[in-house]
């Protein structure tokens, strides 16, 4: 059993995981950029879970190394999180990366070269509310690869009541999630929540875009059938009409967007395989401009 657990990035996903750990009797060290006395998760239909802090804001305030470090910052914040990794990690630390995309290990391993880095796919609908607490709709489920480090992390979260699958075909699982994440770009450019996918014209465009992404996923080794296109579009069309996405929230708050790891990656990987990406060629520059300007 892990005796030292640190959570870097107590946002929506991070708060969800921290709350599960706290409920199971663990006391995760909370690390972020905003000082708070604690964090709170409110799952629909359940009692709130308050995780006592403080949320530390300086690596100098904490002692390391820890057994498990859960990195739940946005990928755009990885460089800013490096001092935490330096302070809290060594060769015995398992670093679980709870981020979108398919490049978690490549992006994080340079910041903690001696640690085992475990990419984790998170399936949950968690959203930070204006008052600061996090709303969770339904259950949270994670997928990690196989292997000793991944299984150690999976065992920790299973002990906390989470559903965690160790998938030997993690490549396929990661690309399946990316097909869903990529559609969030439509929400950012339209400024609308999930109800927008109930428009027939948007659904048709979504199918074409997911099919474009699917070709890239297969070239990268993902074993996904043609049926996944309709499956993904049905998923977003059946979501609660008011459901948002972290990238839409970032756009509203004028924060940098995860456009490259959700959408730009499709273009980058496609170029390596000589694949055309006509929809991405329009979508990605607009997302990049929305994120990084100028203007």
From Swiss-Prot:
Pathway: Cofactor biosynthesis; (R)-pantothenate biosynthesis; (R)-pantoate from 3-methyl-2-oxobutanoate: step 2/2. GO terms for biological process: pantothenate biosynthetic process. NADP(+) binds at residues 10-13, 33-34, 74, 84, 100, 126, 255-258. Its EC number is 1.1.1.169. The keyword tRNA-binding does not apply. It is found in: Cytoplasm. Substrate binds at residues 100, 181, 246. Gene3D superfamilies: N-(1-d-carboxylethyl)-l-norvaline Dehydrogenase, domain 2, NAD(P)-binding Rossmann-like Domain. One of its GO terms (molecular function) is NADP binding. Coiled coil: none annotated. It catalyses: (R)-pantoate + NADP(+) = 2-dehydropantoate + NADPH + H(+). Keywords: Cytoplasm, NADP, Oxidoreductase, Pantothenate biosynthesis. The active site is at 177 (proton donor). It is an enzyme of class 1 (oxidoreductase). One of its GO terms (cellular component) is cytosol. InterPro entries: 6-PGluconate_DH-like_C_sf, 6PGD_dom2, ApbA, Ketopantoate_reductase, KPA_reductase, KPR_N, NAD(P)-bd_dom_sf. It comes from the Bacteria. Catalyzes the NADPH-dependent reduction of ketopantoate into pantoic acid. PANTHER family: 2-DEHYDROPANTOATE 2-REDUCTASE (PTHR43765:SF2), 2-DEHYDROPANTOATE 2-REDUCTASE-RELATED (PTHR43765). Was identified as a high-confidence drug target. Belongs to the ketopantoate reductase family. This is 2-dehydropantoate 2-reductase. The lineage of its organism: Bacteria, Bacillati, Actinomycetota, Actinomycetes, Mycobacteriales.
């Amino acid at each position: 059993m892990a005796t030292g657990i640190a959570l870097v990035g107590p946002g929506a996903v991070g708060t969800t995981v921290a709350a599960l750990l706290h409920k199971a009797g663990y006391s995760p060290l909370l690390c972020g950029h905003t000082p708070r006395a604690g964090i709170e998760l409110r799952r629909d239909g359940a009692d709130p879970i308050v995780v006592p802090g403080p949320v530390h804001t300086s690596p100098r305030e904490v002692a390391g190394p820890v057994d498990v470090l859960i990195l739940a910052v946005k990928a755009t914040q990885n460089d800013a999180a490096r001092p935490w990794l330096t302070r809290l990690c060594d060769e015995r630390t398992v670093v679980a990366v709870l981020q979108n995309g398919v490049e978690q290990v490549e992006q994080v391993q340079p910041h903690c070269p001696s640690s085992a880095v475990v990419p984790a796919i998170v399936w949950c609908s968690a959203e930070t509310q204006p008052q600061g607490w996090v709303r969770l709709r339904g259950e949270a489920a994670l997928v990690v690869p196989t292997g000793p480090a991944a299984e150690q992390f999976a065992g920790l979260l299973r002990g906390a009541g989470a559903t965690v699958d160790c998938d030997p075909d993690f490549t396929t699982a990661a690309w399946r999630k990316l097909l869903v994440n990529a559609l969030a770009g439509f929400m950012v450019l339209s400024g609308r929540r999930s109800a927008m996918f109930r428009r027939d014209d948007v659904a048709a465009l979504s199918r074409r875009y997911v099919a474009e992404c699917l070709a890239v996923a297969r070239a990268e080794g993902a074993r996904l059938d043609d049926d996944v296109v309709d499956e993904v579009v049905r998923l977003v069309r059946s979501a609660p009409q008011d459901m948002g996405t972290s990238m839409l929230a970032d756009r509203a708050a004028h924060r940098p967007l995860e456009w490259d790891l959700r959408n730009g990656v499709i273009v980058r990987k496609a170029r390596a395989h000589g694949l055309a990406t006509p929809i991405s060629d329009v979508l990605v520059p607009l997302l990049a401009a929305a994120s990084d300007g100028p203007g």
